[in-house]
Amino acid sequence: MKGRETMEQYQVTGMSCGACSARVEKAVSSVEGVTSCSVSLLTNSMGVEGTADSSVIIKAVEDAGYGAKKKGVQTQSNSADADLLKDRETPVLKKRLITSLCFLIPLMYLSMGHMMWNWPIPKILDGNHVAMGLIQLLFATIIMVINQKFFISGFKSLFHKAPNMDTLVALGSAASYGYSVYIIFAMTDAQMHQNMDAVMKYMHEFYFESAAMILTLITVGKMLEARSKGKTTDALKSLMKLAPKTAVVIRNEQEIEVGIEQVHQGDIFVVKPGENIPVDGIIIEGNSALNESALTGESIPVDKKEGDTVSAATLNTSGYLKCEATRVGEDTTLSQIIQMVSDAAATKAPIAKVADKVSGIFVPTVICIAIATMIIWLLVGQSFGFALARGISVLVISCPCALGLATPVAIMVGNGMGAKHGIMFKTAVSLEETGKTQIIALDKTGTITSGKPQVTDMVPVEGISEEELLSIAYALEKKSEHPLAHAILQKVEEAQIHDNLEIKNFLAIAGNGLSGKIDKETVYGGNQRFIEKYAKIPLSMIKKSEELANQGKTPLFFACDEQLIGIIAVADVIKEDSPQAVKELQNMGIRVVMLTGDNERTAKAIGKQAGVDHVIAGVLPEGKESVIRDLKEKGKVAMVGDGINDAPALTRADMGIAIGAGTDIAIDAADVVLMKSRLSDVPAAIRLSRATLKNIHENLFWAFIYNIIGIPLAAGAWYMLLGWKLNPMFGAAAMSLSSFCVVTNALRLNLFKMHDASKDQKIKNSVVLEEIQVQNITKQEEKTMKKTMKIEGMMCGHCEAAVKKALESLDGVEEAIVSHEEGTAVVSMTNEVSDDVLTQTVEDKDYKVTEIE
């Protein structure tokens, strides 16, 4: 967060299409002092960076014809801002649509059914043409009042010299309505003069149904578009729910429960087993294992002892902790993640709909053509009625029904297809843009892997069976709450072992392991360092543990009365479909990057098994968001994850894809949710997105071809040559046909097979990541160096322990693996340690170093 300009967030009202958001962004960007402005049509929000005063920014928005309000400062409760983000549009549009249909159906019956197919009508209207016209006028007027928002928005935008899709809808409907009103007066005049031929002629020139149909069909399109908008703005609210509301602090030597806002830096607070850490702090008394999955996304609890740091919203799984608050309020790690999500949501680039972009040119062009058509026909001597009819025909046939429905109808069908296969696209934008992905960043835990540790290997020493090893391990681990212990318990259940050994004097030592007594024998379980204190570990078993660790597995050692009995390896194994999913993504020309907070060795092992292109290990929550920023400079990025630590990265990415088994916040922050938690659904989602986008392009192509052919015909271009002229009624019919064709084409998506990889094609603009990624990986590789020392004089395990302890006490030495049998010490270092220092350290213990490699 440091080094960035302060961002102010605003709620914008009155936007209806991409042209609106573009106008707001342009207006605010021109304000002096604004360095960056980004408007999101999906969230109706605007993020502004710079020094400009908020009142000036709001005035700029209002001058552009829209409304703006500064969002409240983030507090414990953001109910006011959250209320602004609720989806109120869909219910309103649905109500408008249903009400409109109630009046449109009888209007269509009277205008089309009776006139064209002689359907029966009430006797009072039979032959009473003026009354028929007035009834149609009434129905059309009601529908126009119901959908008055189109007229308010459309004409308001026109007056601000920024016509949008609502403008075209309003003009087309108003022109049809106005012409029909004129026809009523003309018919009434003809009726008064007993000119029945004129009355019958006028009777067929009512276009009230066109005015009403235009509004109703566009309302359908608007509702479909509103339904496609997701709930990405719920992410902040979900994040805040993770923060504890209270804390237990020590004041006047008594434990008192207070509101979280009353905790100050330096306060002493206590956390009992099963409770969440209220604020960031440092442990001053006690030890425990903390489940940090809420922040790190890793499922394995981290052992904590005195002096270690703790973070808000992490879960204390075992011991009693007394901590000193170091960061409270907006300074906690959780609050920083919340702020990152907020900023990312506000600065996410707005994606204008294709139809809205085109309508910026299309609308004024059609208006000009309609006006020019009327003028030309008047100049060549035609009557005003003839010229007006040609102008109205242009407006009616150019109605953006097909243009407006091209995207939302395809989106609706695509969303339905995705839902059937457990792939939920939360917004229209997500369905359109997912297929354009060039880079996929995958979180490891729960995405590539199952997220649940499992026993993968059992390596008993000679003379011990796997069942005996598992029985002793079970006796120890069944009293532990550690997730790795759960893996062993699950393995015992699967193996159906019923040897119930009883453990006495059970002791859990934080950061090390477990101990207890079975009959008169003392048994131990834990990591290598812990077991080495109580039993000798053969070099062959050390090498085996190294081999297991290099495969991304965690080796657990078990000993009985100073004798090692074996190793049980536990790992978060990769999902069965992960390698195939990664391969399919690569076959599409997409670069696959794995991000994880794990150590480099584990990360590389998992990455190799999955077959990803690049691995970045040791990435913290803030780091993941930063990596996504860097990757976005190379191309369009999709992030796939499931933990809260992924939320900033999911929101920052061009497309956030959440695994269904993840936390609610990750799902809320994402654009796409994979309900079945299968990585193979990622390439399936990309295929569906590409197919949908192709369908949208086909729909738009049809809409344009229709207008290119229809507009000249409506304008009467062929009248002088062939005598062809288009009645506005047929223009309306053509408009309806164009919409039908668009919907029918969209329905073809139901036949699409999204899991079929046989027709996958590589993207044309594949990106190159080697430079940025190789530099990152090289730096990580340089962090760990190894040297092998040849040592003389070591005779037993005590000698090994002495040399090991001496070497590991050196600054920069991460680990020393010593063997008196081999006469070697393999030293792993994070910093360079000279040969002279290593030699002197060993020889100070009365051993001789003969060689260092």
Give the role of each language-model region.
Residues 1-133, 254-255, 339-347, 751-853:
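Flexible metal-binding regulatory segments at protein termini and peripheral loops
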Residues 2, 22, 35, 437, ...:
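Conserved ATP-binding TGD loop and adjacent catalytic N/P-domain core of P-type ATPases
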Residues 32-55, 205-206, 237-331, 429-473, ...:
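Conserved cytosolic catalytic loops of P-type ATPases
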Residues 92-246, 357, 458, 723-728, ...:
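Transmembrane helix-loop-helix hairpins at the membrane interface
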Residues 95, 314, 438-442, 448-481, ...:
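ATP-driven catalytic headpiece of P-type ATPases
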Residues 116-130, 159, 178, 417, ...:
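Membrane-embedded alpha-helical bundles of multi-pass transporters
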Residues 187, 196-198, 212-273, 304, ...:
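Juxtamembrane coupling segments of multi-pass membrane pumps/enzymes
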Residues 295, 354, 389, 402-476, ...:
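Conserved catalytic phosphorylation-site environment of P-type ATPases
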